[in-house]
Amino acid sequence: MMQTPYTTSTQGQYCHSCGMFHHHSQSCCYNNNNNSNAGSYSMVFSMQNGGVFEQNGEDYHHSSSLVDCTLSLGTPSTRLCEEDEKRRRSTSSGASSCISNFWDLIHTKNNNSKTAPYNNVPSFSANKPSRGCSGGGGGGGGGGGGDSLLARRCANCDTTSTPLWRNGPRGPKSLCNACGIRFKKEERRTTAATGNTVVGAAPVQTDQYGHHNSGYNNYHAATNNNNNNGTPWAHHHSTQRVPCNYPANEIRFMDDYGSGVANNVESDGAHGGVPFLSWRLNVADRASLVHDFTR
């Protein structure tokens, strides 16, 4: 027994073939399957609140929720559904590609933010100011690498090119090589001349034993005079002061005449025959034992 494709109710009928509910005023698309030239059809949409929405009109192929009871048949509506399916797939793939591109962009931003501090670090291979290109001229390393406006100049000859800068009266590296050598030689010559002047101005060392020699000579002169006059004396007293360290100090003792006669001791004939005994504590009158300071 063949089952009826419809279930009729008071509001309409339910089609078992398409699974849709139709009103009495409209017929199911199952009845129009054999009529391929039908220009209009009826579509029923299921709403989220459980109600039924029906739309009549020409071919509609923009809604993604379109449900047609002739999907299993080779009608133009089937081709439209296939196109809608392709369109949905392309839309979903486009959305997924957009999402993936969005996440890639976020990931790239995060990577850039992490590596940004290292990119701001200055490189050590940056251009460095060249040395010896402006200040030294053709002099090489001694010219000094600086700005041409601040080029080093010699304090004497005002040159800016020299193989070596030398110290001068204005401070270190204030003279060129030639002027520095001349300045150094002049400085040494001045120092040597100053030293010679100081040595020449020193007083000439005199004989520190001059007063001793004069006293020694005066002493012998007085002694000879006394001996020539024949005056006997017991202890010699010189009017001239003789230093305590003078080696010619001597003390003579004269014995009485009786002892002198008893001992038969006579002095030299030059003394007038006056006998006396001479005791000398140190023999300073002997030239072999006394140093002559006059030599």
Swiss-Prot record:
Compartmental location: Nucleus
Q: Which Gene3D superfamilies match?
A: Erythroid Transcription Factor GATA-1, subunit A
Pfam family of this protein, just one? GATA
Gene Ontology CC entries for this record: nucleus
Q: Which residues cross the membrane?
A: none
**Which molecular function terms from Gene Ontology are attached?**
DNA-binding transcription activator activity, RNA polymerase II-specific; DNA-binding transcription factor activity; protein homodimerization activity; sequence-specific DNA binding; zinc ion binding
The protein's UniProt keywords, in alphabetical order, are:
Developmental protein, DNA-binding, Metal-binding, Nucleus, Transcription, Transcription regulation, Zinc, Zinc-finger
Biological process, per Gene Ontology: cotyledon development; embryo development ending in seed dormancy; flower development; negative regulation of DNA-templated transcription; regulation of DNA-templated transcription; regulation of flower development; regulation of meristem structural organization
Impact reported for residue 180 to D:
In han-21; reduced fertility. Coordinated apical shift of gene expression patterns in the basal proembryo
Provide the induction entry: Repressed via a negative regulatory feedback loop.
Signal sequence, start to end: none
Record PROSITE patterns: GATA_ZN_FINGER_1, GATA_ZN_FINGER_2
Q: In which tissues is it expressed?
A: Expressed in vegetative and inflorescence shoot apical meristems (SAMs), axillary (SAMs), floral meristems, developing ovules and stamens, vascular tissues, and in the embryo.
**Zinc finger (GATA-type) locations?**
148-202
The record's note on what follows loss of this gene reads: Abnormal flower and shoot apical meristem (SAM) development with fused sepals and reduced organ numbers in all four whorls as well as flatter and smaller meristems. Reduced levels of gibberellins (GA) but increased content of trans-zeatin riboside (ZR) and auxin (IAA). Coordinated apical shift of gene expression patterns in the basal proembryo, including auxin transporter genes and resulting in apical redistribution of auxin. Altered WUS expression from early embryogenesis (e.g. globular stage).
Complex and partners: Homodimer. Forms heterodimers with GATA19, GATA22 and GATA21. Interacts with JAG. Binds to AGO10/PNH.
> What other note does the entry give for this protein?
'Hanaba taranu' means 'fewer floral leaves' in Japanese.
Q: Which PANTHER family match?
A: GATA TRANSCRIPTION FACTOR 18
Provide the function of this protein. Answer: Transcriptional factor that specifically binds 5'-GATA-3' or 5'-GAT-3' motifs within gene promoters (including its own promoter and GATA21 promoter), thus regulating the expression of genes mostly involved in hormone responses and floral organ specification (including genes regulating hormones responses). Regulates both flower and shoot apical meristem (SAM) development, especially for establishing organ boundaries in shoots and flowers, probably by controlling the number and position of WUS-expressing cells. Coregulates, with AGO10/PNH, the shoot apical meristem (SAM) organization.
Please give the family membership noted in the entry: Belongs to the type IV zinc-finger family. Class B subfamily.
What name does the UniProt record give this protein? GATA transcription factor 18
Species: Arabidopsis thaliana
Q: Report the gene name.
A: GATA18
